[in-house]
Regions:
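Active/ligand-binding-proximal structured segments within catalytic/core domains
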Residues: 83-92
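A short acidic/glycine-rich loop-to-helix N-cap element
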Residues: 328-339
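Beta-lactam-recognizing serine transpeptidase/beta-lactamase-like catalytic domain environment
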Residues: 25, 47-48, 53-80, 93-330
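Boundary at the C-terminal end of the N-terminal hydrophobic targeting segment
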Residues: 17-21
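Sec-dependent N-terminal signal peptides
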Residues: 4-13
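Generic structural signal for hydrophobic residues
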Residues: 34, 38, 90, 165-166
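Beta-lactamase-like hydrolase cores
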Residues: 25-53
Length: 339
């Protein structure tokens, strides 16, 4: 993963040529330097790099690669599990609903076991509060608190109401459905809802059944474009424009500011957790003094795991948000996967 963090540092500190597979109907918002850098670093890999200008929703990099060559559908039309990058959205939801506070602390002993369910976690210090749980990407912290939200019978009349509330937050951040960008082939992904879960588990589900969604696995998928837009919503502390790639658009869909459902006060601790991830957490491989806020993700998968990363910079008045998603990356010998 080190080389992908180096890539991100280059993208985030860098600031109209059309790459193969991009639209050809008019001038694009893509920046040649970023696009060429992304394409070069994806050679020999299957994955995508998306960058968006948070100020206006313009897509400034949409680099992709597949075994058959570049294909924008890799970034916009192939929903996959987001892994631990999704913990940012979970934290925002849990804070907004009052399930946790920034000071909520939890022990983690390399994971958690409950009956026949076991979820592992990498070694880190413990207990952790919210910002440290983000920085260290603690699975236990997020799955237990997510499960607590779904099972909270005092705040919600039923688990159906709880999951519907959770889903509404995620949808407000641009997840769970197509955003209707101006590129053909967009897919929306999956956010488990009450109807879906009742069909799948025949009503025999609760917060523990769907623990995996708490850390971005299981019944949740999204595209790299959606992950980049999630980073945009955090960078802007609660708003975004629908991403678009055609310059000087007059379509109001792309000129209308959209607000998330997240409480304004929830953003500060999440931004701080992402800053700490780069400074002393799972993203320290970036090795930069530039004020980057980021979140790593490892996606468990048959064979080699996938790797993901979202980031924005600078921390205040951000100019760029980035998402990287690489399938089956091969870390250098002796380097473990980041969470």
């Amino acid at each position: 993963m080190i080389r992908y963090f180096i890539l991100l540092a280059a993208l985030l500190t860098g600031m109209t040529v059309r790459a193969q597979g991009l639209p050809t109907d008019g001038p694009l918002t893509v920046r040649p330097i970023l696009q060429q850098l992304g394409e070069r670093l994806l050679k020999g890999k299957t994955g995508s790099i998306v960058a968006i200008n948070p100020e206006n929703g313009e897509i400034i990099c949409l680099a992709t690669n597949t075994p058959k060559g570049p294909d924008v559908r890799q970034a916009i039309g192939k929903p996959m599990a987001p892994g631990s990058t999704f913990k940012t959205a979970q934290a925002l939801t849990l804070l907004s609903e009052g399930i946790v506070t920034p000071d909520t602390r939890m022990e983690c002993n390399n994971g958690i076991t409950d009956g026949n369910i076991k979820v592992g976690c990498h070694k880190h210090r413990s207990p952790l509060n919210l910002t440290d749980a983000l920085a260290q990407s603690c699975n236990t912290w997020f799955i237990v608190n997510f499960g607590s939200m779904i099972n909270d019978s005092f705040m919600y009349e039923s688990k159906d109401e709880a999951i519907t509330t959770w889903r509404s937050y995620m949808q407000s951040m641009g997840l769970g459905g197509p955003m209707h960008i101006d590129i053909a082939g967009e897919q929306g992904g999956l956010l488990a809802g009450a109807d879906y879960l009742n069909r799948r588990y025949k009503d025999g589900w609760d917060g523990k059944t769907i623990w995996w969604a708490g850390m971005g696995q299981g019944d949740v998928t999204c595209t790299p474009l959606q992950l980049c837009n999630l980073a945009v919503t955090i960078a802007n502390r609660g708003w975004y424009y629908v991403p678009h790639i055609h310059r000087d658009t007059q379509n109001q869909r792309y000129l209308t500011k959209r607000q998330t459902k997240v409480a304004k006060e929830a953003y500060a601790p999440v931004v701080e957790g992402m800053r700490l991830a780069v400074e002393k957490g799972t993203a320290t491989s970036i090795k930069t003094s530039y004020p980057i806020c980021g979140k790593t993700g490892t996606i468990e998968n048959p064979g080699e795991d996938h790797s993901a990363f979202i980031a924005f910079a600078p921390m205040n008045n951000p100019k760029i948000a980035v998402a990287v998603y690489v399938e089956h990356p091969q870390p250098p010998r002796g380097e473990g996967h980041h969470r």
